[in-house]
A protein has these predicted regions:
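Short, low-complexity disordered leader/linker segments with a strong preference
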Residues: 1-50, 71, 435-448
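Long, aromatic- and glycine/proline-rich binding clefts that accommodate carbohydrate-like moieties
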Residues: 38, 142-146, 307-313, 360-413, ...
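Short, well-ordered beta-strand elements
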Residues: 45-56, 76-81, 106-107, 205, ...
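Short, polar/charged alpha-helical segment
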Residues: 57-77, 411, 430
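Extracytoplasmic "Venus flytrap"/periplasmic binding protein-like
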Residues: 68, 72-139, 146, 170-181, ...
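Hinge/lid segment of periplasmic solute-binding proteins
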Residues: 111-163, 187, 202-206, 217-222, ...
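A bilobed periplasmic-binding-protein/Venus flytrap-type ligand-binding module shared by bacterial periplasmic
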Residues: 166-169, 326-339, 418
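Glycine-centered hinge/linker elements that transmit conformational signals in sensory
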Residues: 190-192, 236-268, 310, 314
Length: 448
């Protein structure tokens, strides 16, 4: 019996070793070739750009946009990684990659509140030389300000968001009621119409919004507080108004008049998709969401209220003004990308007027570029953009600080507990949350 398992009959051990070494070299060359193919997309030699994005409401639109780009830029291949819909969960995914200086992220989307954090951490590439002031002026000023940190700009606006108010115009017409201007009018109108409709329609609620513990809750609650003359936090001055009477009373109103009253108790678990689904299924009279919800509300394949929906500014409290939280998404480049030139080529395309028009027409996303609000095709499909333009221009930002994730964590915990626990002392809880936020903001000032 052969003692050496690789012995070849009729040959000596020297020849056997030669065969083994040759075989191993061939295998190694094959592996090297395959690895090279992964890096350069096979023999085509394409530059691969890893694009990390959050889960959009209409994913097919982004696929179409990427396909157009790759057709017009055959030397570049886009590999898209789609994160979760929740901005909080997507933030966790993206920041973990950037902390690790991951090579599988070149271009990424940022929520409007992230640029200061990403800039301070050194994750986002400064774009001043690539995106100079003459180009910046083509975008809404609020979006440029949101992407600026210490005189450098770190993102290019993709689309703008602000909270808006949707209503069933057919039901308001039926009962000869106006669009509510105040939150109390909304609650009163909802109670009356739901009561009357219950005689024939037992599945109608008065209101639907986003009240789960996540970033969307902060957006919603800021709108109530601001529209009562209150404030959430001032990053520049390092103060929080959560403990002041206007803020406390606004939160109390939500707890006592919205949760489980005008809205079902289940809204405490709702993000945007769940709250919108209640509305488009014809089960909510009023609804707070972002501009994209208009397109879905009027899509016959997704909505039972097509042609029955109106849109307006959010209500406010008596004697105060309407406020809308600034939202929207930006496109940034990883400071660790090895293909920054190709990445910028993709960012330019993605934020162009041409692509923002596609996003407006096919996904209902409000453009960040000012000139598109005069586009006849967009206004024909979304006439309310003309009226809502002022809302987009004056939308109110959340506290602009690199430590915003810590601030948001305090806000989310406080708001969630405050609106879901009827027996807690709101004044005490609010004061405690305000003190926590001021300590966080003091840390930022101490680090400057």
């Amino acid at each position: 019996m052969n003692r050496f398992p690789f012995d070849v009959p009729g040959q000596g051990k020297k020849e056997n070793y030669t065969i083994i070494v040759t075989t191993l070299l061939c295998i190694a060359l094959m592996i090297a070739f395959l690895l090279a193919g992964c890096i350069k997309e096979g023999a085509s030699g394409k530059t691969v750009i890893h694009f990390v994005t959050w889960k959009p409401n209409i994913p097919g639109v982004m696929e179409e946009i990427i396909q157009i780009f790759e057709t017009e830029n055959p030397a570049i291949k886009i590999r898209r990684e789609t994160g979760p819909h929740s901005s909080t969960a997507f933030h966790d995914l993206l920041t973990q990659k950037l902390k690790n200086k991951s090579e599988d992220v070149d271009v990424f989307l940022m929520d409007v509140i992230w640029p200061p954090e990403f800039a301070a951490a050194g994750w986002a590439l400064p774009l001043n030389d690539l995106f100079p002031p003459p180009e910046q002026e083509k975008f809404m000023s609020s979006t440029i300000l949101a992407n600026t940190f210490k005189d450098n700009i770190y993102g290019v606006p993709l689309f703008i968001d602000s909270g808006v108010f949707y209503y069933r115009k057919d039901l308001l017409d039926k009962y000869q009621l106006p669009v509510p201007g105040t939150w109390q009018q909304m609650v009163d109108n909802a109670e009356w119409i739901v009561h009357e409709e219950s005689k024939t329609n037992g599945e109608l609620y008065g209101f639907s919004g986003q009240f789960k513990q996540y970033e969307g809750l902060v957006c919603n609650m800021q709108e109530y507080i601001l529209s009562n003359g209150g404030s959430v936090a001032d990053a520049e001055n390092g103060t929080s108004g959560l403990g002041d009477a206007p803020a406390v009373e606004a939160v109390r109103f939500v707890r006592e008049n919205i949760i489980g009253k005008a809205a079902p108790a289940g809204v405490l678990t709702y993000q945007e998709p769940e709250s919108l689904d209640l509305f488009v299924q014809g089960k909510a009279l009023f609804h707070r969401n972002w501009p994209y919800a208009w397109q879905i509300s009027n899509d016959p394949e997704k909505s039972k209220v097509v042609g029955k929906v109106g849109i307006a500014k959010l209500p406010h409290f008596k004697g105060q003004e309407s406020y809308s939280t600034l939202g929207g998404w930006q496109v940034g480049i990883s400071n660790y990308s090895k293909n920054k030139e190709a990445a910028w080529t993709f960012v330019q395309f993605l934020t162009s007027g041409r692509v923002q028009k596609i996003l407006a027409l096919k996904a209902g996303r409000a453009p960040a570029r000012k000139g598109l609000y005069e586009d006849a095709e967009i206004l024909a499909s979304y006439p309310h953009f003309r009226d809502m333009h002022e809302v987009f221009l004056t939308a109110y930002p959340r506290p602009g600080t690199p430590l915003y994730p810590a601030v948001s964590n305090v806000l989310q915990r406080y708001f969630s507990r405050a609106i879901s626990s009827p027996d807690i002392n709101l004044e005490k809880e609010a004061k405690g949350a305000a003190e926590e936020i001021e300590k966080i903001l003091a840390m930022e000032k101490g680090g400057k």
